[in-house]
């Protein structure tokens, strides 16, 4: 697979104006790590990818890839498969043991609270921890991960990929406090008193509805009414018997 990915990376033209870079919400430096992958320098490629993206194994599986829609090559040919290059770069790095904890060399003595443990909260927490702040992540659910934990089905992204990132963050010094609802279990006054800064990274809990004909019918549900239940993998027992 890696030779195929390198061939795809070689198709990148390193455009004078890289519209893929503009199309990426994270501002990933796509032409640079495409070039490194093509040159078979995977170690440098993952460093360049991690420079703008804390969790490429998440985005490489879940992102709709607006970078590919913006690819200049797509004007008269197939776009570079940027998403697959990203995904193989990070998966290869995990396989080779290159993704390791990066604890700060020095501490600032500052304390930061991050409210919400979705992708935004986790990325903020990791960056803040790595520059030396003492970071605590508050999550009202019983497990850390937010939408990554409760909204993404297993067939889209296995939960072990989230768990190993959380283990990396804990090794770096980030503290997680699940099952803690800010506003009830912990007051805003407590946060502002105990911490030097607070990052609000809570997700949207109210879905946008559609005024479509038949919306009021029984059996039509919002996705987030079902996905958290399914993601918890609720089953009746561990074994079943099939009788015909």
Give, region by region, the residue ranges found by the protein language model:
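Ferredoxin-type iron-sulfur electron-transfer modules and their immediate structural context
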Residues: 1-111, 159, 198-228
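Conserved small/polar residues in nucleotide/adenosyl-binding loops
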Residues: 1-3, 233-240, 244
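Residues forming the flavin
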Residues: 8, 87-238
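A broad detector of the eukaryotic-type serine/threonine protein kinase catalytic domain
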Residues: 29, 50, 54, 68, ...
């Amino acid at each position: 697979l890696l030779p195929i990915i390198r061939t795809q990376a070689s198709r990148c033209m390193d455009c004078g104006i890289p519209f893929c870079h503009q199309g990426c919400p994270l501002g990933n430096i796509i032409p640079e790590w495409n070039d490194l992958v093509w040159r078979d320098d995977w170690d440098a490629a993952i460093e360049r990818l991690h420079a703008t993206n804390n969790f490429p194994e998440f985005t490489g599986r879940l992102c709709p890839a607006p970078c590919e829609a913006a690819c200049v090559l797509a004007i008269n040919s197939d776009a570079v498969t940027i998403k697959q290059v990203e995904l193989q770069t990070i998966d290869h790095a995990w396989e080779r043991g290159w993704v390791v904890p990066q604890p700060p060399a020095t501490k600032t003595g500052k304390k930061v609270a991050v409210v919400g443990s979705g992708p935004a909260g986790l990325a903020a927490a990791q960056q803040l921890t790595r520059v030396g702040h003492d970071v605590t992540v508050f999550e009202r659910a019983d497990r850390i991960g937010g939408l990554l934990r409760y909204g993404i089905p297993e067939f889209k992204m296995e939960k072990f990929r989230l768990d190993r990132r959380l283990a990396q963050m804990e090794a770096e010094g980030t503290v997680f406090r699940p099952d803690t609802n800010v506003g009830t279990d912990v007051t805003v006054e407590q946060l502002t008193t105990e911490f030097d800064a607070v990052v609000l990274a809570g997700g949207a809990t109210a879905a946008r509805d559609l005024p479509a004909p038949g919306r009021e019918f029984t059996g039509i549900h919002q996705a987030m009414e079902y996905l958290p239940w399914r993601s918890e993998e609720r089953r009746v027992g561990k074994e079943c018997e099939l009788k015909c």
